């Protein structure tokens, strides 16, 4: 009976702490996760900027082709930040008369109205169409009077945005039904007999007027087109080019916020120009690569600074978050048996383990004294060569806190 006491095991057993292990961690996964998150954000933002740059160079400021008729005036106003120069090339270099005007550091060229009338008599064969281009600026007004012969016949008068296919290679051409029944047409009219169509232009753009005959007989169409067009004043220009070699370039002013504009014009009717004359040009923009490089550098620097400050805030915020445990840490290090310290420890045990969120906090790390986990999780951190998850100091011992 006297030997029973010697066989009893103590209620609480403290495993001997391994004191010679190096410190590397369960919580290195936190640093790895933060690093991956930073790299992901960095990659996403740089990828978005690359996508935006491609859209600017090949989309907004990509090359475009435009059909021009007589009395046309095109205003081009790209950003001098991203565009170094404007190049206009005449693709059908057979008719003189085009002009390129440049404006540096001046206000937008003022507009004025020009009136002219076109009379066209079209003989449209069966299952065919005829058409011609216009470039019309916002505010232009058109009155189209028509007369269809023989009586009782009907044709479709379709006006589409953008250049049409007349004069293009066969593989670019639309079929008759595509033109006559185009759902995206800006204006679509089935006309017969006599009448008039009124059109108000709300967008500066190239337009193509097409007369399509789907009948199995030839039809004659008489059109009187009265145009009140908006053209741009080019009297105060700082640059002028007459396309003597088939192309012209206008260099943008690099000083910001100086505004730069270019205006391409075609000759008016009556200057050796008929209503059937057309010009086919290509507008292209030379990108200012130094601007894209500068924006990339600024964005890269901003991202690196942001990541640096986030790392500092994360580190400082982590320690400050549990700064209230400093009294517990100081008390435990100063006097293990002090009653006030035990009371503080009892209060801290009301919080759950910051790692497993299951057991109460019943241990502290030495020498720093932080109390943020249960004893089981703290022992795992120590045995896996960890550091204190709060201050990242090397852990020498995990001290278990006993409560009544």
Swiss-Prot record:
Which molecular function GO terms apply here? transferase activity; zinc ion binding
Expressing tissues: Expressed in the shoot apical meristems (SAM), root tips, pollen and inflorescences.
From the Swiss-Prot or TrEMBL record, state where the protein is found: Endomembrane system; Vacuole membrane
Instruction: Name a biological process GO annotation.
Output: mitotic cell cycle
Instruction: Return the PROSITE patterns for the record.
Output: ZF_RING_2 (PS50089)
In the Enzyme Commission scheme, what number(s) does this protein have? Answer: 2.3.2.27
The answer, when asked if Thylakoid is one of the entry's keywords, is: no
Q: Where are the transmembrane segments?
A: 42-62, 289-309
Q: What is this protein called?
A: E3 ubiquitin-protein ligase APD3
Gene label: APD3
């Amino acid at each position: 009976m006297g030997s029973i006491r010697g066989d009893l095991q103590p209620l609480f057993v403290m495993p001997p702490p391994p004191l010679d292990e190096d410190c590397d961690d369960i919580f290195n996964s936190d640093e790895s996760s933060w690093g991956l998150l930073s790299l992901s954000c960095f990659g996403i933002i740089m990828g978005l900027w690359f996508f935006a740059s491609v859209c600017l160079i090949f989309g907004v400021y990509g090359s475009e082709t435009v059909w021009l008729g007589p009395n046309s005036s095109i205003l081009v106003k790209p950003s001098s930040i991203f565009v170094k120069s404007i190049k206009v090339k005449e693709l059908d270099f057979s008719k003189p008369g085009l002009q390129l005007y440049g404006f540096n550091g001046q206000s937008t060229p003022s507009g004025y109205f020009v009136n002219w009338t076109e009379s066209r008599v079209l003989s449209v064969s069966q299952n065919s169409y005829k058409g011609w281009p216009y470039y019309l600026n916002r505010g232009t007004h058109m009155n189209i009077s028509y007369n269809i012969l023989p009586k009782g016949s009907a044709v479709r008068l379709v006006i589409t945005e953008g250049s049409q296919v007349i004069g293009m290679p066969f593989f670019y051409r639309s079929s008759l039904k595509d033109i006559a029944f185009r759902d995206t047409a800006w204006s679509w009219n089935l006309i017969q007999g006599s009448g008039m169509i009124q059109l108000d232009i709300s967008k500066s753009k190239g337009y193509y007027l097409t007369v399509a005959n789907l009948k199995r007989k030839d039809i004659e169409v008489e059109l009187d087109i009265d145009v009140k067009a908006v053209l741009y004043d080019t009297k105060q220009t700082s640059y002028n080019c007459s396309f003597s070699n088939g192309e012209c370039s206008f260099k943008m002013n690099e000083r910001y916020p100086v505004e730069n504009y270019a205006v391409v014009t075609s000759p008016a009717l009556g200057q050796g120009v008929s209503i059937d004359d057309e010009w086919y040009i290509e507008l292209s923009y030379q990108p200012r690569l130094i601007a894209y490089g500068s924006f990339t550098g600024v964005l890269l620097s901003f991202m690196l600074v942001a990541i640096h400050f986030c790392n500092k805030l994360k580190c400082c915020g982590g320690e400050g978050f549990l700064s209230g445990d400093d009294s517990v840490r100081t008390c435990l290090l100063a006097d293990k048996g002090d009653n006030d310290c035990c009371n503080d420890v009892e209060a801290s045990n009301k919080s759950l383990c910051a790692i497993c969120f299951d057991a109460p906090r019943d241990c502290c790390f030495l020498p720093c004294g932080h109390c943020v986990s249960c004893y089981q999780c703290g022992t795992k951190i120590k045995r896996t060569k960890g550091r204190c998850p709060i201050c990242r100091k090397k852990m020498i011992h995990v001290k278990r806190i006993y409560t009544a």
